[in-house]
Structure formats: structure tokens, C-alpha cells
């Protein structure tokens, strides 16, 4: 369905998130989008995990919950017409917790981070799915999956001569999402749904710890 503006007149409560962040996309290593805005192959597809270490939406606690954002844009992100699908852990049982996560990650709750900005580039937003999300947080060796839907495994770069694991980091003092991230690559990165169906294994990945607040 087409994304429409929220008609709610309810005041947005103060919110805060601190999360492990695992980003994977279809760009070559390092992802040129973060430097000049244009993807390696002219389009952008990404699967991103947020493992919330601590968080709240007003009085609603969000600690320990997982959210995956799946995006696809036909061109660069800022050229719009994108598609978004949220996958939220089944562990978010209460309706108010689910609504809080949807408000934040859809951009309706405004605030810091990519959510509100990305929302302006999305033409189609799919109904959120509440699913089992399997998560392993281990820096540049993190992984996450949703059974029968997506599978992501991240791995470090390795020196081809010595076999030594590389310590690769990117620093962006004015970065929108992160200021410092560990650069990695995907051993596996795929999603299979009727709307989003791609396999971009062997491409770019980042691991970071991010912190946002709003509104």
C-alpha cells in the first residue's frame, strides 16, 4: 500500500534507543552512499538489524527487543520511490510496545537517526510482520535471520596472505546513523518475499552501536 502521513493528533512522547546496529546492503565494500550519496550499482537494497540494548517510548520500555528494517530503492535513497518492510520480534507482545516500535522505525516519531528522513523517500510501506528473529551479536561476525524469510551473516575482512583478521573501521563525525563503525562484508544476505526478493551476499556490511532520541 502507499505510504500516507499519520493522521494521529496524539503528542509524540520523548523516546530513546541505544542499539547494536548491523547493516547490510548491495553496495561494494565501504558503501559509497555514505560518502557521496550514490550506490555502487545505481540502486539500493538493505537489511538492517537493531538489537535494542535499552530504550523507551515515553513510559514504555523497549529493552532487549529486535527490529529488522528491509528497504529497497530503485535508484539512490534520496531519489525516493522506495519500499519498506518492518520485521518486529514476537517478544513485543503488548500492543502499546508494538505501536511504539512502529512509530519509531516508520519515522512517525520523528527525532534523530535515519527513520524520519528515510520515511520521506518511501512510496510503499508494507504491513509490519511480528516474527521470530534469531540474533547473534558479535561485532563484525554478527548474524540475524527470520525463518523462511531472510538470512544474514556478517564476516570480517581477512588478509589474503597472512590470514589475519583485518581491523577495518570508518569514522564519520557528522554521520546520520553512526559516527564510528566496523566495516565488514556479508557471507550471506538474502530475503525472499513476494515484494522484496534479493540475494546480495558478498557485499558491504557495517557493525556499530547507535543511539537516537526524539522527537
Please report, for each region that a protein language model flagged, where it lies by residue:
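A short linear-motif detector with a strong N-terminal bias
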Residues: 4-6, 13, 26-30, 63-67, ...
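Short, well-ordered strand-loop elements centered on a beta-strand within folded domains, enriched
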Residues: 16, 39-46, 60, 79-87, ...
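Internal, well-folded beta-alpha domain core
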Residues: 64-215
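Extended hydrophobic/Leu-rich segments
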Residues: 1, 52, 93-96
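Basic/polar N-terminal segments that are highly enriched at the extreme N-terminus
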Residues: 1-14, 212-215
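Short, intrinsically disordered, low-complexity segments enriched in Ser/Thr and Pro
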Residues: 48-73
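N-terminal ordered "arm"
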Residues: 8-57
